[in-house]
Amino acid sequence: MSFQPVKFYQTGTFTVGNRLLDPEQRSVQANMERTNSLNSGHRGCQGCGEALGARYAVDAAMHATNNQLIAANATGCLEVFSTPYPETSWQIPWIHSLFGNAPAVATGIAAAMKVKRQKGLVGDVRVLAQGGDGGTTDIGFGCLSGMFERNDDVLYICYDNGGYMNTGVQRSSATPPAARTA
């Protein structure tokens, strides 16, 4: 059997080969200067889409706010695998809230930052709240609708993975009808 070397080709901006490109051709993800809000070492499942989605979403929010961001995270899979006591994988100011009240906690943080900004104590610090589909559409919908009704200055991210993943993959109200979750 003969040996034939295979040439490596760049297949996208997020592949390992990105570091082999000239610096001006590299993507943001290959740049050492980029924000990394969620570090490696968390306990998410291998290939976890929520970990990757959270990292990209929060990194984008960090970029948009010049790294002036505070996050409120509802109890759920993301919180469980990223912050086992006493450790955390988050590299931003981050607070854990109850299962359905991340929007309420974020509203309080945003109100406090507004007062501190008016007093000249802080700059333009923005607030992000995040939770899974169960904590958002089932348990936390009252807090979320109140936040939207008041037009609070909070970015809310719902990670809809089709069910309550850290408690046995039960369906949530965001799970499509007749979908199999387990």
Give residue spans per PLM region.
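Cofactor-binding active-site loop characterized by glycine-rich and histidine/acidic residues
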Residues: 5-159, 163-180
